[in-house]
Each structure stands twice: as structure tokens, then as C-alpha cells.
Amino acid sequence: MASTPEGIVKDKVKKVLAKYGDELDALWVVPSGMGSPTLDCIICYRGHHIEVETKAPGKLPTPRQLITMEKKEKAGAKVFVIDGDIGCARLDDYLAGIKAGLVEKR
């Protein structure tokens, strides 16, 4: 059980991802200050590359995170910033669209 506001959001995202079973692979990154900057969660689902940055409700990405997001999007990833239920619903809708064949690969 999460004890921080951002941790609560991460738990909500994990519940969304769990709905998609074995076809979805999610790597939750634990930053150590080494290597290249990355976002909180790297997802592969039916050949789609998705990345998620979770934030405490109302918080925004840092300038460094914005640079990382731009880099990921240029490389073809779909990026979500999620700070609560609305962001989780958007991610769920996107994944459901992939499952239904409505979302083309980037």
C-alpha cells in the first residue's frame, strides 16, 4: 500500500495495467542517478511503446522530465503524465483502443 501521493497514483496505474494481462509488459524504473534519465514506467503492449510519468495530484513534470518525454515521443513512444483518475482513464482508453485494433503503431 502506497504511503505517498505519487505512490497512490502509481498503484492506480498498476491496476489499469493489470487488466491487460500477459500481453502487456511494464517495467517500473527505480532511479538511482546512474545512466540516462527515463520515465517511471516503460510499457510494451501488442507492439506499442508507451511510457508513463506519474506525479502527485496537481504536480507537473520537471524540466528534465519534459526533455525526456520529448525525446521518447520523437522516438515513437506514446507518453502519458498521470496524476490521478483522469490520467488513468486516458491510459485505459488508449490501451483498450490498442486491444480493439483502433490505435495504429506510431
Residue ranges and their predicted role:
Residues 1-106:
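Catalytic phosphate/metal-binding cores of nucleic-acid and nucleotide-processing enzymes, i.e., regions
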